[in-house]
Amino acid sequence: MAPQKHGGGGGGGSGPSAGSGGGGFGGSAAAVAAAASGGKSGGGGCGGGGSYSASSSSAAAAAAAAGAAVLPVKKPKMEHVQADHELFLQAFEKPTQIYRFLRTRNLIAPIFLHRTLTYMSHRNSRTSIKRKTFKVDDMLSKVEKMKGEQESHSLSAHLQLTFTGFFHKNDKPSQNSENEQNSVTLEVLLVKVCHKKRKDVSCPIRQVPTGKKQVPLNPDLNQTKPGNFPSLAVSSNEFEPSNSHMVKSYSLLFRVTRPGRREFNGMINGETNENIDVSEELPARRKRNREDGEKTFVAQMTVFDKNRRLQLLDGEYEVAMQEMEECPISKKRATWETILDGKRLPPFETFSQGPTLQFTLRWTGETNDKSTAPVAKPLATRNSESLHQENKPGSVKPAQTIAVKETLTTELQTRKEKDNSNESRQKLRIFYQFLYNNNTRQQTEARDDLHCPWCTLNCRKLYSLLKHLKLCHSRFIFNYVYHPKGARIDVSINECYDGSYAGNPQDIHRQPGFAFSRNGPVKRTPITHILVCRPKRTKASMSEFLESEDGEVEQQRTYSSGHNRLYFHSDTCLPLRPQEMEVDSEDEKDPEWLREKTITQIEEFSDVNEGEKEVMKLWNLHVMKHGFIADNQMNHACMLFVENYGQKIIKKNLCRNFMLHLVSMHDFNLISIMSIDKAVTKLREMQQKLEKGESATPSNEEIAEEQNGTANGFSETNSKEKALETDGVSGVPKQSKKQKL
C-alpha cells in the first residue's frame, strides 16, 4: 500500500464542468460550506479555484459525506510506525526474557551438557584413554580427595596484602609543601561474625587486629618501584575450620587514618596564637578542627561467606573508602553513604570522586611463596580471542565497591600482536536481521564471534551456532543467508510454536514446595525403545538452514512419550510415581506394613475384650485384602469371610463374637437377615465337619479352653443377644439360632 499524502485528494467534479483545482481537504471543506449556503457548487476542486456547475445539492451532500468518511481513516504515518514498532518489540520481548531466564538456570543446574551433543563435539576436549583403567570403586576416593584438597588449599595459605597507595583526589594541596603528609596510617582488622545464641539480640562480632602499615598518599605509580610497597600477611590460623561452629563469616576491615597538616608547634597550618579568639564558641572550634584535622576512612570486604565460600581471589583491587564521622547513631544500625555536596554519588563515580585504597591480594603457601589460590578469571569478552584469555590471570572486584582494573600480561599482548599481523585465518562476520510481518525491523551490528545472543554460549562453529539456535530456541525461526564476509541470520517469530508443558508430568501433581526441584538425580518411568532401523547420520550441511522454497515452516509435532508418560491408580485416581512402577499396585491393596499397622492399632483398644479384638483383626484384614468399599458388597463379604476364616473362628471359640458382629452390621442396614442365616448355616456345617473329623469326644483340655474362653468375656454378649429375641420382619428368634451353635 503506497503511503498517502495529505492534501493529495482533489478535484474531479462531475461532467465537463469539473474544476481544475487540487484541493484535498480544502475542496471538501468548500463543498460542505457551499452545500450549506445554497447548494450550487461542484463536488470538489473549488477549494483550489474550481468553477461552479449546475449539479444538484444532493451531489454536494454526497461529496461532503464522502469527505467526512475519509477524514478519520487517515492518520499520520509516524503513529503507524511507532505502533508497529511497539508490537515488534513486544513480540520479541517475551521469548527473549524466557531464554535469558533459562540461560541463568542452566548455568546453576544444567539439564544437559553441550559438549555431549553431536553438533558440539568440538567442545569435548576429554579423551577416553583412562577408560581402560577405570574402576567404579575409585570414584568415591577421588571425590573425597578432591574435596579435601580444596578445603586445605583455601585454608592452608597465607593471605598477603600489598598496598599500592591511598588515593584522595578531591583533597586540596597544601600551600606549605614542606609540611605536606606523604603517607597515611592503615589498620587492617579481621572481623569475625559469630553465630547468634538465643539470648543474643544480634550476631556477636569479633575484631582481630592484624597489623598497621604506612601507606603512601597519592603516589605516582610510574616512579615507584613495585618492591617498595608495604605488605601485610594474615596467618591462616585465623581461618581455621575448627571454629566453624562459632564463626559464621570472615571479612577484612580497612581503617585509614589521615592526620591533619600541622606545623612543628602543634598548630594547624595557617593557625597561630594570635588567630585564636577566646570568645569563639567551643563547638564551632571543634567542628573546624575536625574538618582540618584527623580524618578516618573505612571499608569492609568479605573473605569467606556464611557458606565457607572464598570470595577474595588473587588480583588487584581498588576499594572505595567512606569517611567515618562522629555521630550518635548506634553502630548496629549505622549505614555508610558517600556524600559530595549533599548529593549521593552513583557507585562507579565514587572511584573518581571519593577516596580509594589500592592493593594486590595473593594467597601463598608461605610468606614469600608463589600464589596458590585459584586465579580470578577475567570477564568473558564477546570476541574471537576469548578462548586465549581463559587461562590468563585477571582481577575480580565485588559489585558497587570495587572497580574492575583490566590488566594484560606481556604474553597476552605479544599474542594479540601476532594475531593481528597474521591474517591467514579469516573471521566470520555474523549479524542478525529481525523480521516482523515479513518486513525488516532491526538489524544488529556485525560481530566476529559465534556466541548465541540469548544464552551467550560459544558455539565456535557456524554450523553449531545455527543448529543450537534451531534446537534450543525454537520460539524463533532462523534462516541462514550467505554473505561474502560471513553470514546473515534472519530471525522471526515462530507463530506455530507449541508452548504446552513438555516436562516431567510428576512435577504437576507434586506439592508446591517440591515441584520442579532438581536437587539431584531422580528415578524416571522405565521405558523400552525398539530400534527398528538406525539410518546413517547425514553429513552436516548449511543447506538445512536455508529458507524453504514452498514457504512452509518445519514444525516438530510434540507428543508425550517415554519418560513423560503418566499413569494413575485405578482406585484412588492418584498419579503413579516412578518408584511404584515395579510393584503391581492394582493387585496388592494390603501391603505387609499396612497389615501390621492395622493389627497394632486394634491391639491398643482398651474398651473391647480379646475375643472382639480377634474378630476385628480378621475382618479388617479381610476387607483390605479384597477391597470391599460399598454397602452392597457386604453380603458377599460375610459369606467369603466364613469360607476363609470359619475354621479359625471355630477353633478360637469366636462364634458368639462373630454373631455379635453380624448383628451390628444388620443394625446399620449393611446386611440382611438372609445373609445372617446363610453365614450361620455355613458356620454350623463347618463345625459339624470338624467334629466328625476329630474325635467324637473332645479332650479335657479343649473343654477347659472353651470354658475359659467363655469366662473371659465371651458370655458378655448374652445380655445383648437376649434383647434381640426376634426380628421385626421375619419374626425368627435369633437366640434360638445362636444356641444351636
Curated annotation (Swiss-Prot):
Biased composition annotated in UniProt, kind: Polar residues: 707-717
Interaction with AEBP2 and PHF19: annotated span: 148-365
KO phenotype (gene knockout): Mice exhibit early embryonic lethality and defects in gastrulation accompanied by reduced methylation of 'Lys-27' of histone H3.
Span of zinc fingers (C2H2-type): 450-473
The keyword ATP-binding appears for this protein: no
Residue span of region VEFS-box: 565-641
Keywords: Chromatin regulator, Chromosome, Isopeptide bond, Metal-binding, Nucleus, Phosphoprotein, Repressor, Transcription, Transcription regulation, Ubl conjugation, Zinc, Zinc-finger
Name of the protein in its database record: Polycomb protein Suz12
Taxonomic source organism: Mus musculus
